[in-house]
């Protein structure tokens, strides 16, 4: 997606006009314009020059983002222009100048005429002089705020009226009619028609013309200031980017601008300094605070070979590192780019506002014209009718309509970024909260992904220390993942590391054997150990209990005699069960996917508290499982992104967990920087809060216009005598956008990890707790076309216990989902009876 800056937009009608113009350019497949950030994202093959030309033809300005930069200098972190709030100071100066001239204008028009406040002697009883003074002061205020007239009438000429058009028409009509009344009063005074003079004097609306412009400027300043607050999170990320780095060149330390750092350069970081770019530690060790990227305040220990990231703080030791990712490739720059891209996209709910915005301003102008005509036909004066029409123009607010969605999206996205939760698009931020089913990959998501020693059970006559020492010595030469758990425990317990076994041998799928000081040590699974040692029934039952708890029992023997069991398991993370409880509190069904056998899977599922366990799922079968789950509701798939890409893509929402510094996971819609499952309910909670905020903003905007426009038009005058002065209409318009933005800023106070106010969503159906299903993948030869697929699918799904079958003749596979145990022979016979050959079932 190419990014562009867009200038000249003032309301939702403007952004809709730009979007419509760019979508007509040949080669553009998608265009999204953000009124909040004055930016535009365009996808397709169209040339930037053609896109810019289309925007300019529509009456606005455009430029390609980052076009002036190249190479490493094009880092998103270096976008200083974005950090500067240039809009608010300009509006403030315009407002101060307007107030300087509005004050005497209001004094003359309201103070003297209504309350008899004193005026200079030459103006006493000189109504023409009073009128001319008001005219001159109004002209000055209009010149100061000429931006409204230039943009407003330019939009009108291009057939795209906007908020500025409404302001310009309202203020211009007030000024035009007042000028007419002034000249008519002058003629009356020359003719000594004092009744005419007094009548026309009360038809002056100069103060309304100036006050409308000033009040709208007040609203614009409040809006600009508040909009600046919505991007605080993104600005904070940009400010984290280091400006310089200390490189080692020819043995000397040289400080250089960050743009000059290249991949492979060696840099040094002292305690208290920020790490300039992503790299690998070559020398030294330290504790690094990564809260800037992950939101985790606890420092992470870094040693030789560990990765470090730009903008993180080196808290303790001196480290020498090699640069691995610089410029736009650093983790920080990717995060900034992701947040920026999300801000440039539109949530589906924004389409409601877009559709309304396209016709809103023309409709308001039409309503104002009809209002004036009706009141004139009803016998009211031109001044009265015009006041009602002007009130309609200035109270209507398309700007608030355009800001209702993007400000909430920006604040919500920023809140997520500060807490290590990255939403890739506005659509993903909106959709996450609608999740009904969460599918969790077991390894690395529910569990730590690293086996840990859970039980050390020595045989009679052997103590724990002796068992651990012998097991540690034997496992030292093993490359099996389970061996690492025992080695880690041995190191923690201070086991003698000098002992070495001889004649070491590893038996695949069985165990290990070796000699130590003339004795034979053996270790492995039950089947392997029974070949060399006797295992009693009591020990067998003990191992079965361990297996039922999701643990893997490893047996050890010395000279053919069992010396004990050490149980190893991929233990669930500390926050996993709490996260599942929080998801349940939201009314979300939780499903666990794993390739483990049913017994182990059910044990882990029980510990985590999930609703359903789907065991025996191979990596390629996860996508099929997600496809079936989607028939039951909106599905979010949570995985580590390594072998979960198809499932993450297939799900309504793909969530990659534990990405750490590697956030470039294309398959995911949401990236969680920390390996913390509790961030999943937090992301859903934040999404729901953001969507609720958008609904509040849209309701307020529509409610405001539905109530305000009839009031301004004078609908209630015949019944209650209620009428709205154009000045109060302008004040209401100026405050409406401010209220919308301020409401969005309330999201900054939202506590995304607080489950106290969670509400359950309506589920499609009740599901039985701990329902267990399995999948089997069949390799089938002989399928040639879609007809073959349909035949095999129908055959398999006719078997009792088969819930679904996903068949592919191209891959030569059938992924079968089972709700009950079905023997492989039954599946094989059913398929082969249809003249296909089954070569394997897993």
Where are these predicted regions, by residue range?
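Conserved cytosolic catalytic loops of P-type ATPases
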Residues: 26-43, 48-49, 203-204, 235-329, ...
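Transmembrane helix-loop-helix hairpins at the membrane interface
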Residues: 90-244, 355, 721-726, 732
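Juxtamembrane coupling segments of multi-pass membrane pumps/enzymes
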Residues: 185-189, 194-195, 210-271, 302, ...
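Conserved catalytic phosphorylation-site environment of P-type ATPases
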Residues: 293, 352, 387, 400-474, ...
């Amino acid at each position: 997606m190419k990014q562009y800056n867009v200038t000249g937009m003032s309301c939702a009608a403007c952004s809709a006009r730009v979007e419509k113009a760019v979508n007509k350019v040949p080669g553009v497949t998608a265009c999204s314009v953000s009124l909040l950030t004055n930016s535009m994202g365009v996808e397709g093959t169209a040339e930037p020059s053609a896109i810019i030309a289309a925007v300019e033809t529509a009456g606005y300005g455009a430029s390609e983002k980052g076009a002036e930069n190249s190479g490493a200098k094009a880092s998103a972190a270096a976008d200083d222009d974005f950090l500067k709030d240039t809009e608010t100071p300009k509006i403030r100066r315009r407002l101060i100048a307007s107030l300087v001239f509005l004050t005497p204008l209001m004094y003359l028009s309201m103070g003297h005429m209504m309350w008899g406040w004193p005026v200079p002697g030459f103006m006493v009883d000189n109504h023409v002089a009073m009128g001319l003074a008001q005219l001159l002061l109004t002209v000055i205020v209009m010149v100061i705020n000429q931006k409204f007239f230039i943009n407003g009438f330019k939009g009108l000429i291009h057939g795209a009226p906007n908020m500025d058009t409404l302001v310009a028409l309202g203020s211009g009509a007030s000024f035009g009619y007042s000028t007419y009344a002034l000249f008519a009063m002058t003629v009356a005074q020359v003719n000594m028609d004092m009744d005419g003079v007094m009548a026309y004097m009360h038809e002056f609306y100069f103060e309304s013309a100036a006050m409308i412009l000033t009040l709208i400027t007040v609203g614009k300043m409040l809006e600009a200031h508040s909009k600046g607050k919505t991007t605080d999170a993104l600005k904070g990320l940009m400010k984290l980017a280091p400006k310089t780095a200390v490189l080692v060149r020819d043995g000397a330390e040289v400080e250089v601008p960050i743009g000059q750092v290249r991949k492979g350069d060696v840099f040094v970081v002292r305690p208290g300094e920020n790490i300039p770019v992503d790299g690998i530690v070559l020398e030294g060790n330290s504790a690094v605070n990564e809260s800037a990227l992950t939101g985790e305040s606890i420092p992470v220990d870094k040693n030789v070979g560990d990765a470090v990231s730009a903008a993180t703080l080196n808290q303790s030791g001196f480290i020498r590192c090699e640069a691995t990712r610089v410029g736009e490739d650093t983790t920080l720059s990717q995060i900034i780019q992701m947040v920026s891209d999300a801000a440039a996209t539109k949530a589906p709910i924004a389409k409601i506002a877009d559709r309304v915005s396209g016709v809103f301003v023309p409709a308001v102008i039409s309503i104002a014209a009809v209002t004036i005509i009706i009141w004139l036909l009803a016998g009211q004066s031109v001044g009265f009718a015009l006041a009602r029409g002007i009130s309609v123009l200035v109270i209507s607010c398309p700007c608030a309509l355009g800001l209702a969605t993007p400000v909430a999206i920006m604040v919500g996205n920023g809140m997520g970024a500060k807490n290590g939760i990255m939403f890739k698009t506005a659509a993903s931020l909106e959709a996450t909260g609608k999740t009904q089913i969460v599918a969790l990959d077991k390894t690395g998501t529910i569990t730590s992904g690293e086996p840990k020693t859970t039980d050390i059970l020595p045989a009679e006559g052997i103590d724990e220390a002796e068992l651990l020492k012998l097991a540690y010595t034997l496992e030292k030469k093993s490359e099996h993942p389970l061996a690492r758990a025992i080695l880690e425990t041995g190191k923690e317990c201070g086991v003698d590391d000098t002992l070495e076994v001889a004649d070491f041998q590893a038996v695949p799928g069985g165990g290990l054997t070796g000699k130590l000081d003339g004795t034979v040590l053996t270790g492995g699974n039950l089947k392997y150990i029974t070949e060399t040692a006797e295992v009693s029934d009591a020990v067998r039952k003990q191992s079965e209990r361990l297996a039922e708890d999701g643990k893997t029992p490893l047996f050890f023997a010395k000279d053919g005699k069992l010396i004990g069991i050490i149980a190893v398991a991929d233990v669930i993370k500390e926050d996993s069960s709490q996260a599942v409880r929080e998801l349940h509190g939201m009314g979300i069904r939780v499903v666990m996917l794993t390739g483990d056998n049913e017994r182990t899977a059910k044990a882990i599922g029980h510990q985590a508290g999930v609703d359903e366990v789907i065991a025996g799922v191979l990596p390629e079968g996860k996508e099929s499982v997600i496809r079936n789950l989607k028939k039951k509701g909106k599905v979010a798939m949570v995985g580590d992104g390594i072998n979960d890409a198809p499932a993450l893509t297939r799900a309504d929402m793909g969530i990659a967990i534990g990405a750490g510094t590697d956030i470039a996971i294309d398959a995911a819609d949401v990236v969680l920087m920390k390996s913390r499952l509790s961030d999943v309910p937090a992301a859903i909670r934040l999404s729901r809060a953001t969507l609720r905020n958008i609904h509040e903003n849209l309701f307020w905007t529509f409610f405001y216009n539905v109530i305000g426009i009839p009031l301004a038009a004078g609908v209630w005058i015949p019944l209650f005598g209620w009428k709205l002065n154009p000045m109060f209409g302008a004040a209401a318009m100026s405050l409406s956008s401010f209220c919308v933005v301020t409401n969005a800023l309330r999201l900054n106070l939202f506590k995304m990890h607080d489950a106290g106010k969670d509400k359950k969503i309506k589920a499609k159906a009740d599901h039985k707790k701990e329902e267990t299903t399995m999948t089997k993948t069949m390799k089938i030869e002989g399928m040639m076309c879609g007809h073959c697929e349909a035949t095999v699918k129908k055959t398999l799904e006719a078997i009792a216990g088969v819930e679904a079958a996903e068949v592919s003749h191209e891959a030569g596979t059938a992924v079968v989902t089972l709700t009950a145990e079905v023997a492989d022979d039954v599946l094989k016979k059913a398929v082969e009876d249809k003249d296909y050959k089954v070569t394997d079932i897993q």
